[in-house]
A protein has these predicted regions:
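Sec-dependent N-terminal signal peptides of Gram-positive bacterial secreted proteins and lipoproteins
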Residues: 2-21
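Active-site- and interface-proximal helix/loop "cap" or "latch" segments in soluble metabolic
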Residues: 23-122
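Conserved N-terminal/central alpha/beta ligand/cofactor-binding core
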Residues: 123-139, 170, 179-294, 419, ...
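Beta1/beta-strand and adjacent pyrophosphate-binding region of the FAD-binding site
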Residues: 138-156, 172
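Helical element adjacent to the flavin cofactor pocket in flavoenzyme catalytic cores
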Residues: 272-332, 373, 379
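A glycine-rich dinucleotide-binding beta-alpha-beta segment and adjacent secondary-structure elements
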Residues: 303-305, 499-590
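Glycine-rich loop(s) and the adjacent beta-strand/alpha-helix scaffold that form part
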Residues: 322-325, 329-399, 597-606, 610
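An anion/pyrophosphate-binding glycine-rich loop and adjacent beta-alpha core
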Residues: 373-375, 382-501
């Protein structure tokens, strides 16, 4: 009987092997592809009819991509298909792993169609609808109970959970993705703070005047067209240095530089070692794991519970997990740190009709969906400035992704990086606000613009090996002469289209800008010519293609200075708090670059501390 069963199983497995796989050359294939970053090396073992094994050999991915590296190889082997769903929150890494297996199958002569069948989808326990206010009764008993419940595991959520538990409250952090970090982990690792424990040293190195809190506040409010809430801006500005020093004390490594992105008129932007947000979120997670806080991944909030009695208080949440639904009590409060809604076309397009579905976003699509706002609105929360949505001007024009190379044009203007259009002419004040730069790029006449520089210009924030890696990856274009660079730019397709840059225009543009550095004035666009700017005097020359991509939503839930969420009548909703991109009012119409990290980290820490203690931290001045 056992022998008959064994034969039956063998036949079943044979029948399960994809049809038309015969003729595939068995062997082990090593493929090098791009995930979120270059250098993803995958070893694929094939028989003459099946995918036998998939092994990640080397990679440069950051923590948001780790779940894809761990889970996807086994999923592909089990399904015998490269059409398996990617891992939520790790799309770029997932695509890289699948591309490597596809390359191996192609090299082996396989019929790709046979290995591209879509597996049956599992039932999604988390519904797409959002409950109407009052549609669910508050539980009489709870599956779990904590003092503080934090929803979301990015900058704000990790900071909030840490300050709450360190202030003496039992704390749980729930995150809908399979890892913490979210969009915070893939940002550019740029952190604005008017001072820090290393500020004086860096200011002395670059001969810079000390910055002030008042100037940071002024720049932020002006950069948002005076639509910010001044008290919230003040909290961010004073909280940011405190939290940066906390990170530095716990081992955060930053580059030996200070930058001045567009809209800032002080050198106050610190750059993390790898110019990626996971430098911060990985450290935040390490800090949190050294406390008694509980972290629950793949746990999606689907309802906020608010009582209907006189207290009318938020007392907990309902979540969906792979094992079903459960309820979590929050004895002191729920902190929403769920991020923005840039990936939710149905949510963003009614606010800004031009942000159509075909426009890419820099963010993880599964992360920036806005349900934290929807669910808070369902219990009466108010929103503000929802139509203030920012595009990142320097994303990869072919993908919309904010990769590490898209950070250099953002950091570079204060050191001499210039932006040119498809003819090789400057089209904007490179030191201006993001919205100004994005609008100028869209109106430049082509679907890409270019950041132009030489190695000395970017030496303060780009290592030589990083520059060479960018060239090897194809994202950074290099020419020993301007003639060669023009040829490289014109040969680089942007969504099937090609520019018409001329070396003569590039030369004239560079010579004119060099003269502006010497004279200290830019009569063309009024850029502030800084002493840190370096002239482009000899090759090799470099260019990075860049174009706007939907990035940050400045609007969100209305909060007060305690981070308490307010309702549609202007009253505080007891027990409900929020921090980070889920809130509105900090940035006004436009967020200055590097203020996002400051906003989320500062308000996350403030929120956790206040919910736990009922007081604001000592570093916050009287408001």
């Amino acid at each position: 009987m056992k022998r008959i069963m064994a034969i039956f199983l063998c036949l079943t497995l044979l029948l399960a092997v994809p049809a038309m796989a015969e003729g595939m050359k068995a062997g082990t294939y090593t493929e090098t592809v791009k995930g979120m970053f270059d250098g993803l090396v995958v070893e694929v073992t094939l028989s003459d009819s099946a995918i036998e094994n998939v092994v990640i050999k080397e990679h440069n991915e950051t923590s948001p991509g780790y779940p894809a590296l761990e889970k996807l190889p086994g999923m592909i082997v089990e399904a015998q298909s490269i059409a398996v769903d990617g891992i939520s929150g790790a799309t770029m890494t997932s695509n890289g792993v699948k591309a490597a297996v596809e390359a191996a199958l192609t090299e082996a002569g396989a019929d790709l169609a046979a290995f591209s069948k879509v597996p049956e989808a599992e039932e999604d326990l988390a519904p797409d609808y959002y409950p109407v206010m009052g549609s669910f009764e508050v539980p009489e008993t709870w599956d779990e109970s904590y003092d503080v419940v934090v929803v979301g595991g990015g900058f704000a959520g990790l900071a909030a959970a840490y300050s709450a538990v360190e202030s003496g409250s039992s704390t749980v952090l729930v995150e809908k993705l399979s890892t913490t970090g979210g969009n915070s982990a893939i940002n550019g690792g740029q952190y604005a703070a008017y001072t820090s424990k290393v500020a004086a040293e860096l200011q002395k190195k670059f001969n810079l005047e000390p910055d002030t809190a008042e100037k940071h506040i002024e720049d932020t409010i002006k950069g948002g067209d005076n639509m910010s809430v001044p008290e919230l801006v003040t909290e961010m500005v004073y909280g940011s240095p405190y939290y940066l020093d906390l990170l530095l004390d716990n081992g955060l490594v930053i580059r030996d530089t200070l930058a001045r992105p567009g809209g800032h008129y002080g050198y106050r932007t610190y750059v993390t070692e790898n110019q990626v947000g996971s430098d911060i979120t990985d450290l935040q997670l390490k800090m949190l794991k050294n406390t008694d806080a509980v972290i629950e991944l793949e746990t999606k909030m689907v309802e906020i519970y608010r009582t209907r009695d006189e207290a009318n208080r938020v007392v907990g949440i309902r979540v969906a997990t792979a094992d079903g639904y459960k309820t979590i009590e929050a004895r002191k409060g729920v902190i929403l740190a769920t991020g923005g809604f840039s990936s939710n076309v149905d949510m963003r397009q009614p606010q800004v009709p031009s942000l159509t579905a075909d426009l890419p976003t820099t963010n993880i699509k599964a992360a920036s969906t806005g349900e934290g706002i929807y669910l808070a609105q369902a219990i009466g929360a108010n929103t503000t400035q929802m139509s203030n949505i920012q595009r990142y001007p320097w994303a990869d024009p072919n993908t919309g992704v904010l990769d590490s190379y898209a950070v250099w044009p953002f950091t570079g203007p204060s050191y001499g990086v210039i932006y040119v259009d498809y003819n090789g002419n400057r089209y904007v004040n490179e030191g201006d606000r993001r919205d100004v730069c994005a609008n100028a790029a869209v109106n430049s006449g082509f679907i890409s613009t270019y950041a132009l520089f030489t190695e000395p210009v970017v030496s303060a924030f780009v290592k030589p090996e990083e520059l060479e890696a960018g060239v090897q990856s194809g994202r950074v274009l290099k020419g020993e002469t301007l003639e060669e660079l023009a040829e490289k730019i014109n040969a680089f397709a942007i969504k099937g289209q090609y520019p018409s840059v001329t070396a003569e225009n590039l030369k004239a543009t560079i010579e004119k800008h060099n003269g502006y550095i010497d004279s200290g004035a830019d009569p063309d666009f009024g850029k502030v010519m800084a002493a840190t700017m370096v002239k482009m005097e000899e090759g090799p020359y470099y260019a990075i293609p860049q174009y706007p991509s939907v990035h940050h939503t400045m609007g969100g839930l209305v909060i007060d200075t305690n981070t308490s969420v307010k309702d549609i009548y202007g009253q505080v909703i007891p027990g409900l708090f929020a921090a980070g991109e889920v809130t509105g009012g900090v940035h006004g119409t436009n967020r200055l670059g590097s203020n996002a990290d400051a906003d989320a980290c500062a308000f996350g820490y403030i929120s956790g501390y206040f919910v736990s203690t009922g007081e604001l931290p000592d570093f916050i001045p009287d408001l």
